[in-house]
Amino acid sequence: MKNKHPLSKDELQLFRESVVDAKKLRQDTIVHRKPKPKTKQIAPQRLLQEQVDASHYFSDEYQPQLEEEGPTRYVRPGYSAFELKKLRRGDYSPELFLDLHGLTQMQAKQELGALIAACRREHVHCACVMHGHGKHILKQQTPLWLAQHPDVLVFHQAPKEWGGTAAILLLVELAE
């Protein structure tokens, strides 16, 4: 393959002489994330089963003890409260997002179950659930459901850039 603009030896020598004192710039502004492993296509029936299995944990009768004052937050018993602080101050950024606007409670439970299953399957540690304000039904129920799931380690009301009082950031326990 021929070069479109071949340089003569004199031109190459002139270029090398002109850049001999150049210093390499240090790149410190862009964070390179690790490439995600390619995920296999999953059969729709298996996805549906994952949704059903994961939503099995969500009960409307059980009311976990959540703090009523301040922002919505939860730390699984036996887990470090420092992770909650790191989540609150933005050390984690969500990689998966779920928007529950316009869904019924049953649909929302299934979608939450699917989100948690997807996080575990794709090795995503942090996710964001946008429940919205609306009639406050999903806003009240979402934290109660999340606190019941054994794979949810921590959740906290999202900062403004991720939805504020209309969203929750959560950390999911990953399979080894």
Swiss-Prot record:
<dbReference type="GO" id="GO:0019843">
    <property type="term" value="F:rRNA binding"/>
</dbReference>
<feature type="domain" description="Smr">
    <location>
        <begin position="98"/>
        <end position="173"/>
    </location>
</feature>
<keyword id="KW-0378">Hydrolase</keyword>
<dbReference type="GO" id="GO:0004521">
    <property type="term" value="F:RNA endonuclease activity"/>
</dbReference>
<dbReference type="InterPro" id="IPR022990">
    <property type="entry name" value="SmrB-like"/>
</dbReference>
<keyword id="KW-0699">rRNA-binding</keyword>
<dbReference type="InterPro" id="IPR036063">
    <property type="entry name" value="Smr_dom_sf"/>
</dbReference>
<comment type="function">
    <text>Acts as a ribosome collision sensor. Detects stalled/collided disomes (pairs of ribosomes where the leading ribosome is stalled and a second ribosome has collided with it) and endonucleolytically cleaves mRNA at the 5' boundary of the stalled ribosome. Stalled/collided disomes form a new interface (primarily via the 30S subunits) that binds SmrB. Cleaved mRNA becomes available for tmRNA ligation, leading to ribosomal subunit dissociation and rescue of stalled ribosomes.</text>
</comment>
<comment type="similarity">
    <text>Belongs to the SmrB family.</text>
</comment>
<comment type="subunit">
    <text>Associates with collided ribosomes, but not with correctly translating polysomes.</text>
</comment>
<keyword id="KW-0540">Nuclease</keyword>
<protein>
    <recommendedName>
        <fullName>Ribosome rescue factor SmrB</fullName>
        <ecNumber>3.1.-.-</ecNumber>
    </recommendedName>
</protein>
<dbReference type="InterPro" id="IPR002625">
    <property type="entry name" value="Smr_dom"/>
</dbReference>
<keyword id="KW-0255">Endonuclease</keyword>
<dbReference type="Pfam" id="PF01713">
    <property type="entry name" value="Smr"/>
</dbReference>
<keyword id="KW-0694">RNA-binding</keyword>
<dbReference type="GO" id="GO:0072344">
    <property type="term" value="P:rescue of stalled ribosome"/>
</dbReference>
